[in-house]
Amino acid sequence: MDRRSLALLMVVVMMSPLTGSIAASSSASTQGGTRHAEAQIVEPDHLTSVPEQSDIWWDPHSNWWDVTTLDMDRNGIHDSIQEAVGPVNVGLSFTRAFTDSDRQILLSMGFEIRQELPVVDAVLLGAIDPTEAVGLSQIDGVAMVERYGSLVFYGDVQTPAVKASNSSDYPIGAWDLGLSGSGINIAMVDTGVDNEHPGLVGKFVAGYDAVCYVHSDPQCILAGGREDDGSFDPDDGNQHGTACMGMASATGLEADGTQSQFYGSAPDAGLVDVRIGTDVGAGPFENYLLEQEFYESAMNGLQWIIDHRDDAWPGVEKEWHGIDIISLSWGITSHEDGGSDGSDMHSRILDEAMELGVVVSNAAGNSGEDNDGLSGMSASSLSITVAATDDKNTVNRTDDEIAGYSSRGPRKDNGDGNPLNELIPEISAPGTNIVQAEACVTSGSCNNFLGGDASENTYTGRGSGTSYATPAVSGIIALVMEANSELTPLQIKEVLKHTSELRGEPSAPEVDPYWNREFGYGMVDALASVELAIFLRDSGQTGSIDPTLQSHGLNLTQTDVINITGHAWGQAGSVDRVEYRVGSGPWHEATYSDPPGELGALTPFLWHVILDPKELEEGQHIVEVHASSGDSHSLPVFYEVTGEGGGASSRGIPTAALGLVVLVAMGWAGSLVLARMRSPDEEEAAIDAELVD
């Protein structure tokens, strides 16, 4: 071998270890595992594809009337009607839309139709003799003869405690992100709202009086009854409605123009004032003199909201059109042992509202720990049911407890085989000893009946109840909707659950590892909710979020490796994969623990993201993880990790590119050696050749 060949061989031999060391980042063993997807490490006992999961065992398309516990003998009659003595108020729920033919049949049988509820394919008939229920149940298309329920109203530090406003305990609140509920309308369905109150001035965009009594507002009678175009502005003859709207949206202004700290969660949200109760038969401390009319008014008000949810209200700007949120601080008692199972028409109408794009926030009830089940409304399968905490009159949440009066779950089983919709309440918020905006009726010198108003009133008198926790959540929903207008009601519900502060041990771990019968999925966190809503908006992920896909982080450790562990499962089907990314980088699939046996439906499996910090650029990085199925995925979880900047990927240069650089360097070095080993004659010839014209 001549000198030139020997020199070239020596260069190649000396350079080859360098190429090997660079290529090793995609295949070398680290900490007992192998490399996978740049910085990821796959442990030997981990799976690289998602474990197989069993299908759900219930039929998600079953008809409520085929499974409801309200009619155990399946004769089409609410069981409590068959036990009643004397007149009972009833409605008919149909398996299809109510028709003119049905209307004529009822009239021919001598029944008056008091209210039609097309959104739930139902009509209200009022009082009948219980013996007439059999004939009604035999009308073609009748799913069930239902009994009316009885309506019950559930009745400073609240806003900073939910992290809407900032405080010394929580220096950043949702308002600090530029959110206040502007452009979002809350339908306060209650005893009316005195929106002349200094903290509620300018909020009214529309209203409707679902029940018109002279005792509460003579203007209703003088105007000729109800106006259904949204132009009527009801007053509050009780106090309950004004107090609730204040907790959702008060600005804190006083009559003299000074600023108090008595804000609602969304101080710039608008008011759609839907009165369903009055000072006769409606208040929490009154006799129910007009129970039948009260129930019908409540259903009438909810039907009106759904019918007018997209209306352009008279005299208001386009941004204030429609109805975004229903806030309900009352319930409907059940006639069955164990409370409502959510299949009654007053629960179903809330489910329909959620599916039609109106978010429903409703109170869990004030029956405490040993309650006889949740009421209708509180038992709705899809709406957001709110429990109340006692904040001990402090902003700091560490001392908060569930309020003694707050109704506990779960809801009565509705017979559909799905255990998830029994996990109510879903969320909790402060509801104890809350300062109220004063309605006109609370002041001795003010009475709507005499033409007075609440314009000189202030914020006094403390009240407690899930009534008062609910509007705080309604205001937070307004903040979330303002932050991300593309979120659906069910996505918003999932955002609130996902970002809540966990409290209490899981009450049904075989169904869900996080739900607690007192707190639901935890204490609502306005700041975390709007931060997540903004992230989904800015990252373009909103349309891909499936609320039935679950992924939650469990643990992060960082020593020689970064080890993130969590679990995932599907609530309506299987998870295809769990994915992660570092910063805005490409998505990679996580690895999985091998489960000891077959995974049943609703059973979480463990996922892992194990990274070499030396392969990440020096500094802090956000790792984002979600569970996916098809083109949809769960809400993400985030972990902050520290890169140590020791690897190729940390410099942003792919391994293949580095290998190419080395090969080029080898070629250059080899050519240099060859050039230096040329004979003098060869070198001179080369120079002469370059000088030729």
Which stretches of residues belong to each language-model region?
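C-terminal subdomain of the subtilisin-like protease fold in secreted/lumenal serine endopeptidases
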Residues: N63, I323-S327, E482-Q571
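Surface-exposed intrinsically disordered loops and tails
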Residues: I56-E83, S168, I172, V211-D235, ...
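Short acidic, glycine-rich surface-loop motifs adjacent to enzyme active sites
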Residues: L302-S340, A363
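Long, low-complexity serine/threonine/glycine- and acidic-rich segments characteristic of extracellular
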Residues: S544-N555, I562-G647
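Secretory targeting signatures
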Residues: M1-R35, G645-D693
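Extracellular S/T/G-rich loop segment that most often corresponds to the catalytic His/Ser-adjacent loop
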Residues: Y208-V214, S378-A478, E482
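Subtilisin-like serine protease catalytic core
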Residues: G173-Y208, C212-E296, E319-D324, E355, ...
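Autoinhibitory N-terminal propeptides
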Residues: S5-L124, D129-G173, E644
